[in-house]
Amino acid sequence: MKHLLVTNDFPPKIGGIQSLLWEWWRRLPPDSFAVLTSPHADAAAFDANEPYRIERTREPVLLPHPWMVQRINAMVKEFGADFVVLDPALPLGLVGPRLSVPYMVVLHGAEVTVPGRLPLARQVLGHVLRGAQHIIAAGGYPAT
């Protein structure tokens, strides 16, 4: 099965989530997935050294809007992806129900604690999680 990872947080951008995603995905067969992510000044050199497909948008941040849904669906069709992995669950997970294939979300600790304090955000996160085929917990805290 092939899939598409859609994220704002991918190397060469530096950070904990970026490192986690890279460590997880670099261990997969390179022809089993592609990445759609945001731009970075050092992306050309990084992307050239990776054995899998990385496509970067022009927009500095991937946000849930109709154009993003179209972009993801087009890449799904072209690549032949069977499902999409969205990271983070909020806000990117909001595009999930509009995708042409099933979606999964990566759930981080902040996405559990912040919506817990904001009633509307809690409802939105609940909607995203209920629609997801699978939820990938990024650690023990969001898993519980």
Give, region by region, the residue ranges found by the protein language model.
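A short, active-site helix/loop in glycosyltransferases that binds the activated sugar's phosphate group
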Residues: 132-144
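Structural alpha-helical scaffold elements that stabilize or flank donor/cofactor-binding regions
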Residues: 77, 127-128
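A short, charged, and often flexible helix/loop element on the N-terminal side
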Residues: 47-75, 85
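Short His-centered aromatic/hydrophobic patch
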Residues: 86-92
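Short, charged/polar "capping" segments at the starts of alpha-helices
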Residues: 41-46, 143-144
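N-terminal subdomain of nucleotide-sugar transferases
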Residues: 1-42, 50-55, 130, 134
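A short, histidine- and acid-enriched strand-loop-helix "catalytic/donor-clamping" loop
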Residues: 13, 63, 81, 93, ...
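Charged helix-capping and loop-helix junction motifs
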Residues: 119-126
